[in-house]
Regions:
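Active-site loop/oxyanion-hole signature of alpha/beta-hydrolase fold enzymes
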Residues: 3-13, 40-48, 52-94
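Active-site glycine-rich loops that stabilize anionic/oxyanionic intermediates
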Residues: 31-34, 97
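Helix-rich cap/lid subdomain of alpha/beta-hydrolase
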Residues: 118-152
Length: 152
């Protein structure tokens, strides 16, 4: 589904199901340079077993428009805002890679909304290729394209 958040079209995968606020909710958060496709199988599985499943594409990722957020804190605040706009009050949050850091940050900002956290392949430090760091300084969009290319 698409919704307008912060004046941008924001895509949130729901597994093709309508959101029913009385159902339990799981939200999956992708890592840097990724999108909701990281969770295709999980989204389908839980959506077809009575859960609301949400997996938003962060700004500038996947089908969402806008400039990518510049920090983990911005990602967490953005995610909270999107879920609040949809009407989700409590949820389980699953993060992959950088999404784990977003989930951890969200747990510090607003712990009362979480029923649980799932960390998938997270790390406290992620080594980054020196060439990519240089490209990010010169041309952030080229660096993003390289991450997507190298990731597939």
């Amino acid at each position: 589904m698409y919704l307008n958040y912060n004046s941008n079209d924001t895509f949130v995968s729901t597994g093709g199901k309508n959101i029913e606020l009385n159902k339990p909710t799981i939200c999956f958060v992708h890592g840097a340079g990724q999108n909701h496709f990281s969770f295709t199988q999980q989204i389908r599985y839980f959506a077809n077993r009575g859960y609301n499943v949400l997996s938003p594409d962060f700004p500038g990722h996947g089908f969402s428009k806008g400039i990518p957020n510049s920090s983990i804190e911005e990602d967490a605040k953005w995610l909270l805002g999107v879920l609040e706009k949809i009407g989700i009050k409590k949820f389980v949050l699953g993060g992959h890679s950088q999404g784990c850091l977003t989930a951890l940050e969200l747990s510090q900002l607003k712990p009362e909304v979480l029923k649980g956290i799932i960390f998938i392949a997270g790390a406290s430090k992620i080594p980054v290729n020196d060439f990519l760091i240089g490209k990010a300084s010169e041309d952030p969009y080229k660096a993003y394209d390289l991450m997507v290319t190298w990731g597939h």
